[in-house]
Swiss-Prot record:
InterPro entries: ARM-like, ARM-type_fold, TPR-like_helical_dom_sf, TPR_rpt, UCS_central_dom. It comes from Homo sapiens. This is Protein unc-45 homolog A. Keywords: Acetylation, Chaperone, Cytoplasm, Deafness, Developmental protein, Differentiation, Myogenesis, Nucleus, Phosphoprotein, Repeat, TPR repeat. Pfam families: TPR_16, TPR_8, UNC45-central. GO terms for cellular component: cytoplasm; cytosol; Golgi apparatus; nuclear speck; perinuclear region of cytoplasm. One of its GO terms (biological process) is muscle organ development.
Length: 944
């Protein structure tokens, strides 16, 4: 059978003017045989235009497909063959021709289906069989090729750089695949070695947001934890080019560039992490140089005109993360000193820029706060007075340069810069305030008729009132001015700031009930106005933030706290504001919540010391009656009902430098207060509090981490850890809990950590291994000797659960230690709960390690009395544990069994074996059966 041509008719010349379908078909066949494929195609097309039967139509379409194959027009060949198959599904010629067309089009998976159908219709046709074998081989080769990373990379770049694929789903999928491929080390290396960085540079130059995002995210995979690739990437793209992407208007692109630069910083500072990456392909002589070039470009970006406000904020965020030392124990702060010398003035320029009216530098509502945080981090990273003095000198010189000889605009810029310093390194800010004429200018500008001048001056006055000394000065000189502004100004933005100034001065006494700056009731009036502005949706978020600032100060007063938590609308507005992009409000929100929950540190003063202070006429702070525990508990419940946990979870998720270590500490304090009562913990877990506490416990100040870890411990004790911390998150809880075992933590924190670890150790072997890896066992053993009975008991219970691990069993089995002796002795203590824990540990160990059974008689001469006491206990659990230990000892050695049977133990076991079908009865009976098996005792006549 021939399948390559349309047919084999008798050759005869074409008849001009022939009109019948049959005649035209035969003419087409003749032309096809003569190699005139165009003429044949025309004849078949003409025949189709006549009144052809469905069968004739199928043949004609099939023949047209053969012509298109010869003419190498494979798309049309596939179309014609498909039309023939629609007319006759069993047409093997049409199926074969379509398979040929599909093969040429590269659609091998579809071609093989048609060939398989041909073979099923004509199993003995060798042409079909051979074609199927050939195409099968092609498919295997294509699979091998397509599975190789090189092919993937080449294919994806072809799609991404193809101008005709603009905006297609194919292009989007290729960009996603490229990003995923770069996350694997092998994929990242292939992309890098296939000139991937140069190709990615072309994507960046195209300017399309989606392509730029794909390119930046792919570069993240290439540079992640790899120094040499990072340096090579910076060399190819240009450090300036990479940094400049931060300044684009697109927020998504700017954030992606920020992430890339963060990865580059980490790679340059840390190098390759062993175990995660292979050997580097190049040797880096001095990565510190590349690091400085990168930081230098970031500093230049801060003051570059045309950079977006979001880009400037991202640059500040990168500097905050990259420059200061991670730990003050690291002696090298040279990078900080270099940044102060090279870029302090540039940072101050951002801090002194005004958002409204816009100046030369575009800034956001968060820019000044980010600059303040960076300045604070740099100042805290200094080691000696000489370094701090240099910092002060540079700041003062910069402020003087604007304050002197620059007119009113210069004075405004200088005062704004002072405000930035007061929010960050306040020591530098206070010194700047003492410069000649600065404070006087602040007071004078408060009375200005220009709104922007008043805003700058009033904000500076508010920040200056932070210190008690400064507050006293302002109370004497500026209160009347602030009151006039509050009462007379027509601008809400001025009034609300003046109100915050009054709030701050009114709270200068803190929680001390006896120290009030204003008359009785004044703070309540101020708080009421703050709540009113907070709830006003017509006012912009930036202005409403100041209302929260005011409440953060006023909530030191317990009367204000009580009214605030009763105001559901104000709480709702507060929580909504914390979720907005106005991130600078986070610290004020957290401060207000700390005050409402009384979660700051408070130690009850010694009554004798109080009397002594009164006798010496020293001031003694007094607690407000409404700050007593009953009032605090009521406020906590109202906050929980208002949805405080959900708001705090959103705050913790914030990726912003505004979420400082101090802010995280405040949130940790509030969480700890929220979980104090057992009945409230379910609400906290249900609203996501458990997962929010983990990052708080792993990062922040030491106090904040400890508070968050303690809150985690409380949740782990009273709720199912697998439900509270689902999936892999449960393993992240272990480290914070172990940190509470350190000696610098309180006894309560030690106790709660031990109880929480006990629960975790009872869940799975993987969790026990995690506890062992965190080196918790030596600390737990130490607490087993603690004098406090509850801590000693909790440590013993924890060790009992850990004893299920092979490594812990090895510790007990090792020679030359008293671990086993301690458990035996604790099994004889009067504390029933301690007895139960120790006996449980003994039962576990003797079951898992029979060799320990022979050592029990050696650790103490009172071992037999202790075991007998366990079996004679009125507590079923103690009896059962004791019976299991005895059974393990009997089964371990005939010699030990003989010693036990020669004592009163046999009588005790005999009595217990006659009980009901309880676990104790079964264990006692098993002991006696084993003794009978050894021939140590004889069964009685009843066979018992």
């Amino acid at each position: 059978m021939t399948v390559s041509g349309p047919g084999t008719p008798e050759p005869r010349p074409a008849t001009p003017g022939a009109s019948s379908v049959e005649q035209l078909r035969k003419e087409g066949n003749e032309l096809f045989k003569c190699g005139d494929y165009g003429g044949a195609l025309a004849a078949y097309t003409q025949a189709l235009g006549l009144d052809a039967t469905p069968q004739d139509q199928a043949v004609l379409h099939r023949n047209r497909a053969a012509c298109h194959l010869k003419l190498e027009d494979y798309d049309k060949a596939e179309t014609e063959a498909s039309k023939a198959i629609e007319k006759d599904g069993g047409d093997v010629k049409a199926l074969y021709r379509r398979s040929q067309a599909l093969e040429k089009l590269g659609r091998l998976d579809q071609a093989v289906l048609d060939l398989q159908r041909c073979v099923s219709l004509e199993p003995k046709n060798k042409v079909f069989q051979e074609a199927l074998r050939n195409i099968g081989g092609q498919i295997q080769e294509k699979v091998r090729y397509m599975s190789s990373t090189d092919a993937k990379v080449e294919q994806m770049f072809q799609i991404l750089l193809d101008p005709e694929e603009k905006g297609t789903e194919k292009k989007q999928k290729a960009s996603q695949n490229l990003v995923v491929l770069a996350r694997e080390d092998a994929g990242a290396e292939k992309i890098f070695r296939s000139n991937g960085v140069q190709l990615l540079q072309r994507l960046l130059d195209m300017g399309e947001t989606d392509l730029m995002l794909a390119a930046l995210r792919t570069l993240v995979g290439i540079c992640s934890e790899h120094q040499s690739r990072t340096v090579a990437t910076l060399s190819i793209l240009g450090t300036r080019r990479v940094v400049s992407i931060l300044g684009v208007e697109s927020q998504a692109v700017s954030l992606a560039a920020c992430h890339l630069l963060q990865v580059m910083f980490d790679a340059l500072k840390e190098g390759v992490k062993k175990g995660f990456r292979g050997k580097e392909g190049a040797i880096i002589v001095d990565p510190a140089r590349e690091l400085k070039v990168l930081i230098s470009n970031l500093l230049d970006l801060l003051t570059e005109v045309g950079v977006s406000g979001q880009g400037r904020d991202n640059a500040l965020t990168l500097l905050i993360k990259a420059v200061p030392r991670k730990s003050l124990k690291d002696p090298n702060n040279s990078l900080t000193l270099w940044v102060i010398d090279q870029g302090l003035k540039k940072i101050l320029e951002v801090g002194g820029s005004l958002q409204d009216p816009p100046g030369e530098l575009a800034v956001t509502a968060n820019s000044r706060m980010s600059a303040s945080i960076l300045l604070s981090k740099l100042f805290d990273d200094l080691k000696c007075d000489a370094e701090r003095e240099n910092f002060h000198r540079l700041c003062e010189n910069y402020i003087k340069s604007w304050f002197e000889g620059q007119g009113l605009a210069g004075k405004l810029r200088a005062i704004q810069t002072v405000s930035c310093l007061l929010q960050g390194p306040c020591d530098a800010g206070n010194r700047a305030l003492e410069l000649s004429g600065v404070m006087e200018s602040v007071i004078a500008l408060c009375a200005s008729e220009q709104e922007e001048e008043q805003l700058v001056a009033v904000e500076a006055l508010i920040h200056a009132a932070g210190k008690a000394k400064r507050a006293s000065f302002i109370t004497a000189n500026g209160v009347s001015l602030l009151k006039d502004l509050y009462k007379c100004s027509e601008k809400d933005s001025i009034r609300i700031r003046a109100l915050v100034g009054l709030c701050k001065l009114g709270s200068a006494g803190g929680t001390d009930f006896s120290m009030k700056q204003f008359a009785e009731g004044s703070t309540l009036k101020l708080a009421k106005q703050c709540r009113k502005w907070l709830c006003n949706d017509q006012i912009d978020a930036g202005t409403r933030r100041w209302a929260v600032e005011g409440l953060a100060y006023l909530t030191f007063d317990a009367d204000v706290k009580e009214e605030f938590v009763e105001d559901a609308a104000a709480l709702k507005a507060l929580f909504q504001l914390s979720r907005l992009e106005e991130r600078s409000v986070l610290f004020a929100v957290a401060s207000a919540l700390v005050n409402c929950t009384n979660s700051y540190d408070y130690e009850e003063p010694d009554p004798k010391m109080v009397e002594l202070a009164k006798y010496a006429k020293q001031h003694v702070p007094e607690q407000h009656p409404k700050d007593k525990p009953s009032f605090v508990r009521a406020r906590v419940k109202k906050l929980l009902a208002a949805g405080v946990v959900s708001a705090m979870v959103c705050m913790v998720k914030t990726e912003s430098p505004v979420l400082t270590s101090s802010c995280r500490e405040l949130l940790s304090r509030v969480f700890l207060a929220l979980v104090e009562e057992v009945e409230d913990r379910g609400t906290v877990v249900a609203q996501g509090g458990g997962r929010a506490l983990i990052p708080l416990a792993l990062e922040g100040t030491d106090v904040g981490q400890t508070k968050a870890a303690q809150a985690l411990a409380k949740l782990t004790i009273t709720s199912n850890p697998e439900m509270t911390f689902p999936g892999e998150r449960i393993y992240e809880v272990v480290r914070p809990l172990v940190s509470l075992l350190h000696l610098n933590c309180s006894g309560l924190q030690n106790f709660e950590a031990l109880m929480a670890l006990t629960n975790l150790a009872g869940i799975s072997e993987r969790l026990r291994q995690k506890i062992l890896k965190e080196k918790a066992v030596p600390m737990i053993e130490g607490y087993m000797f603690e004098e406090h009975e509850m801590i000693r008991r909790a440590a013993t219970e924890c060790m009992c659960n850990l004893a299920m691990s092979k490594e812990v069993q090895d510790l007990f089995e090792a020679q030359g230690n008293d671990r086993l002796k301690l458990l035996v002795l604790y099994s004889g203590e009067d504390d029933e709960l301690l007895q139960r824990a120790a006996a449980g540990g003994l039962a576990m160990l003797t079951s898992m390690r029979p060799t320990l059974c022979s050592r029990i008689p050696q650790v103490t001469t009172h071992w037999l009395e202790i075991l007998q006491a366990l079996l004679l206990s009125s507590n079923q659990e103690l009896q059962h544990r004791g019976a299991v230990v005895v059974l393990n000892m009997v089964e371990a050695s005939r010699e030990i069994a003989s010693t036990l049977m020669e004592s009163e133990m046999m009588e005790i076991l005999s009595v217990l074996a006659k009980g009901d079908h309880s676990p104790v009865t079964r264990a006692a009976a098993a002991c006696l059966d084993k003794a009978v098996e050894y021939g140590l005792i004889q069964p009685n006549q009843d066979g018992e």
